Design a protein with these regions (language model features):
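Periplasmic/ER-lumenal interhelical loops and adjacent helix-loop junctions
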Residues: 1-52, 72-76, 83, 130-149
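Contiguous transmembrane helix-bundle modules in multi-pass membrane proteins
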Residues: 55-77, 81-210
Length: 210
């Protein structure tokens, strides 16, 4: 459950290598719904401003299905393994909600940015919690399976949120922001994809081959 939440607010884990939260039964489940730079800030802002919009109701239904295994399995003939490849459907809806929120100057991103920042801060706190090693010793900053990768993911996610805050300030001041939003979004997409691909290769069995 927590891994699903994390994957929508931060860059998702590399397939088959859960990082902060282990899930042996869902390593290849394609859990992920993060929108580069925007995270869930645009979705939250849109939902707050237009609570009766059809997309808000649809996303709530999708969230319920994602959290309840039997409803989630209905998307792939009630298979016993947890898969989340159907997430691409609500992700497209959330991208639309984010775009509409960005285009409508009356919608403020402040609450969405604050909530996303709070979730990222909570994940950072969890990552530094002490962990008992196989020798019985207590180790700090090793709660994540791959601490270095988690640190990079967290930094990129926070940087995206800071860019979004800057763009929202331009919007509130009535200044042109679309070019800045486009460049920032493309940069965030490249950074997010590069981080996943790079660590997917370096953490593999034969990194030299790639």
């Amino acid at each position: 459950l927590v891994r699903i939440i994390q994957s929508f607010f931060m860059i998702p884990d590399v397939p088959a290598r859960p990082n902060l939260f282990s899930s042996d039964g869902a390593k290849w489940s394609s859990i992920g719904g993060y929108l580069p730079m925007f995270s869930m800030a645009g979705v939250i802002a849109f939902a707050k401003a237009k609570r009766k919009h059809w997309s808000v109701k649809l996303i709530i239904i999708c969230m319920i299905c994602a959290f309840i295994p039997i409803l989630n399995s209905a998307f792939y003939t009630f298979n016993s393994s947890y898969y989340a490849r159907w997430f691409y459907m609500p992700i497209l809806i959330m991208a639309m909600m984010t775009a509409q929120a960005l285009d409508d100057r009356s919608i403020r991103f402040k609450s969405g940015i604050a909530i996303c920042g709070g979730v990222m801060a909570a994940m950072a706190v969890i990552a530094i919690l002490p962990k008992k090693t196989t020798d019985g010793d207590i180790a700090w900053f090793e709660f994540a399976n791959y601490p270095a990768y988690f640190a990079v993911v967290l930094i990129i996610s926070i940087a995206g949120l800071l860019l979004l805050y800057f763009i929202d300030r331009l919007r509130r001041k009535g200044r042109s922001f679309m070019t800045a939003a486009l460049v920032s979004t493309v940069t965030a997409c490249v950074a997010c994809t590069s981080s996943v691909v790079y660590f997917g290769v370096t953490l593999g069995s034969y990194p030299a081959t790639y």
